[in-house]
Each structure stands twice: as structure tokens, then as C-alpha cells.
Design a protein with these regions (language model features):
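C-terminal cap of thioredoxin/glutaredoxin-like
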Residues: 60-134
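Structural alpha/beta surface segment adjacent to cysteine/selenocysteine redox centers
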Residues: 1-63
């Protein structure tokens, strides 16, 4: 990515209502804070996803990211934000038949699951080698 040889595109693919709320919350952050919020969501997922009231815990995570409880509530109730996240999810499902997360798409080829970095690097290196030959 840093060399400009690879482009990374992150797309939300919520598999349940809680993941949907998290994706919606990130979308409601200011544009320049989107990826820092996503990092906080994923980095603290074990802390909020498996508690008795995960929605309240997610709201607390929002506070860490600078999203007030009022903004969080308005965001997760916003039909436009909901429709936007679901469109991205549904497009990924239709085009790539995504069934789980994480899923990566490299040159239109779907790669399912969490790969060790060495294996993922091999996939990327092979695709970069193909691109050089063109």
C-alpha cells in the first residue's frame, strides 16, 4: 500500500445487528476520524461484543472515539446510514459471495478467512508478479 503497488479498500460487512450498529457508528464519525474509530471498534471488540448489554458498551466505545451518546443514538437510528451500510454489504454479497469476515478480494479473487501474514504476502506477491508481466 505504501509503495503504491496495492490499493486497500475497506468495506463494511456486518453479519449481525451489533456489527451493523458498530459500522453505522463509524460512518457517523467525521470523515477524518472514520479509520481511527474503526480501529477502536475492532481493537476493543472483545470488550463490548460479549457483554450483557453490548449496545450500551458500544455506545461507551463511541465516547472513546469522540461520539456522544446522543450522536450514537441518532446515528444507529438513521435510515440513510443504515441503507448505506447495507448497500455495501449486499453489493459484496452479490459480487463476491462473501459469507464470512474477514474476506479479502485481490484482483477480483475472493480470499476467505484470517490468513497468516506469510500466506497473504504470497498471494499478493504472486498477483504483483502477474501485474509486472503485463
Amino acid at each position: 500500500v505504501e509503495t503504491g503497488k496495492v490499493k486497500f479498500v475497506f468495506r463494511d460487512f456486518p453479519l449481525d445487528r451489533l456489527a451493523l450498529a458498530a459500522a453505522m457508528m463509524a460512518r457517523c464519525a467525521p470523515k477524518e476520524r472514520y479509520f481511527p474509530v474503526v480501529d477502536i471498534i475492532f481493537g476493543t471488540q472483545q470488550n463490548w461484543a460479549k457483554v450483557a448489554d453490548p449496545a450500551a458498551a458500544l455506545s461507551q466505545i463511541g465516547l472513546l472515539a469522540g461520539i456522544s451518546k446522543e450522536t450514537y443514538q441518532a446515528c444507529v437510528s438513521n435510515k440513510e446510514v443504515f441503507d448505506g451500510v447495507m448497500k455495501i454489504r449486499n453489493d459484496g454479497d452479490k459480487k463476491y459471495k462473501v459469507q464470512s469476515t474477514p474476506t479479502f478480494v485481490v484482483n477480483e479473487k475472493r480470499i476467505d478467512g484470517h490468513l497468516p501474514i506469510e500466506r497473504f504476502r504470497k498471494v499478493l506477491d504472486a498477483e504483483l508478479a502477474k501485474a509486472k508481466k503485463k
